[in-house]
Amino acid sequence: MNAPAQLQRALAELLGDARLGVATLPGSELRLWLIDAANMDRAFSPDETRRILEEPPYWCFCWASGLVLARWLAEHPHWVRGKRVLDFGAGSGVAAIAAARAGALEVMACDLDPLALLACQANAALNGVELSYSADFFQETDRFDLIIVADALYDRANLPLLDQFLSRGREALVADSRVRDFRHPLYQRLALLDACTWPDLAEPAEFRQVSLYHAQRS
């Protein structure tokens, strides 16, 4: 199976030897186009490091929080069944795809990065589901039952988004592995679960523990 051409070209511009391949996620039936792990097992040149930092290809990894959220929806489909769902910062689309497979009425993958939206399209096709797509969360109307979010809080400047999620959806389900002092009056932790980014980046153990938070409009 050939990798999506536009995604492969974009990845090769960052890392000349990088290749996309189909990976089955651990503890899941989902398959995604992800970077081949062999490309990560070497030192990067200064130019490669600069390019990665300027345009990080988040979409070619399945981050631990996304994997936790996808597994959670597969195990607890009542969270999305028959609902309109928006996946904020969708990346590879793993959570959006899991929501669609769990019986959501509609799932929108939302990401600022056009390459991420292409990855979502390719991965949706790989898993036999249909998604809709948006590049601007704030252009969407308040019509969603649930906003799902994975690893959007890696930058603490994004914390105000916790309120914005509830401006577009009646509920929010947020998976996060970065914020250790998470406090918000509307969000309650549902679970603390273990997962790793795929391909495995050998992240510190603390980043393999993912908290799942739920909020509902007051």
Please report, for each region that a protein language model flagged, where it lies by residue.
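N-terminal auxiliary segments of SAM/dcSAM-dependent transferases
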Residues: 1-41
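A short glycine/serine-rich beta->alpha loop
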Residues: 43, 51-60
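Conserved SAM-binding loop and adjacent beta-strand
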Residues: 56-74
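Conserved SAM/SAH cofactor-binding pocket of Class I
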Residues: 70-132
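Conserved beta-strand signature within the Rossmann-like core of class I S-adenosyl-L-methionine
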Residues: 170-180
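Active-site capping/gating segments
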Residues: 180-218
